[in-house]
Structure formats: structure tokens, C-alpha cells
UniProtKB/Swiss-Prot annotation:
GO terms for molecular function: 3-isopropylmalate dehydratase activity. It comes from Cupriavidus pinatubonensis (strain JMP 134 / LMG 1197). This is 3-isopropylmalate dehydratase small subunit. It comes from the Bacteria. HAMAP family: LeuD_type1.
Amino acid sequence: MDKFTVHSGLVAPLDRENVDTDAIIPKQFLKSIKRTGFGPNLFDEWRYKDVGEPGMDNSKRPLNPDFVLNQPRYQGASILLARRNFGCGSSREHAPWALSQYGFRAVIAPSFADIFFNNCYKNGLLPVVLSEQQIDHLFNETNAFNGYKLTIDLDKQVVLTPSGQGYEFDIAPFRKYCMLNGFDDIGLTLRHADKIKSYEAERVAKMPWLNNRVVG
């Protein structure tokens, strides 16, 4: 996955509490065995006026002009500003996939559902927890100013506003290490590839019968 060090991006405000994973990526789009192609159906039931199904040409579907991601001022947003309990509901990993594939690098909220929170880290999407008061201030700023951008410095663990105000956030050291270096579970395992190969070779030498193929 991509490294996350410092990111500056346009903010899109999603002013709803308890946004669940079925709203983030509806269940009918979970049939694919691939991990790609979910971005166009992010918040599908809110972005479009019709009912979406896999295989539809989204470019021909009627958009909901009132939904935040369809408004011109938020096109190209890479930081999602949300309310409490974001990502509640089922544990589908497709939810952070859809957010990342749409173009979001981070979600800032006062609280997240636990499983969604963990899935974000495993897929390179940074979940940032700030206080309710700080979130309220950011919503006010984002709504008041076109082109409102934030900078997230993961190494320093701070969110910087255009005025230079900084909001510090917490992150577990191991998760921070993985995000800074772009390590998902597979990447962490591959760091030990030489040791794994050495162990496998040693095992074959000591217990060759384990490699015998049983037929019948």
C-alpha cells in the first residue's frame, strides 16, 4: 500500500452521524472477487438518484446534486470530514477500499466503529480522531471557505489548518510505523522473506518426508 507521511488535500464535509458501511458501499457491490473498482459506487445510494447495480455505466446515471461529493466545490477532495461513529455496521473491508479508490487518503471524525477503524489501517486509509469541538470548528471552516484544505503530518501527528492552527491526534506506534512505511499485512510478512526461505530450506533438509506427495 502507499506510504502516508504528509498529505495536503481538499476537504469534503459529510455532516451525518452513524454512517454505516452499507451506506459507504452498498451490499450489491460486494459480489466482486476483485479488490478494485469500488470507488465509483462509494455512497452509491446518496450520490445517485436511481438504484445502482453491478455493471451499470455510472456515467449515465442521474446524480443527486445535493450530495456533497457531487458539488463542484468538493471535486477532487482527498480528506473526508465526518461525524461520530463513522463506519458502523457490518465489517466489510470493501468500505475502506471504496473510500481509498474514490481518492480519499484520510477520514477525520470524533469516533469510528472499531472494525472499520482497524480495516482502514490495513488498507492505507488514515482514520484521524479529533474532539467534537475541533470537528465542529472544521465543519464551520469547510462550509465557509471554498477550496478549504488541511495538511495531515503523520510523523508529527498533527492536522494543520490553513491559518496554521494545529490539532494533535493519537495513533498507536505500530500503526504509525506501518502507515509511514506503507506496510500492510503482506508487506510486513515480506520483510522476513529471507528468514522464511531459510526456514523452509532447513525444514526440508531435516524433515524431507514432509514434502512427499501423498497420492490416492
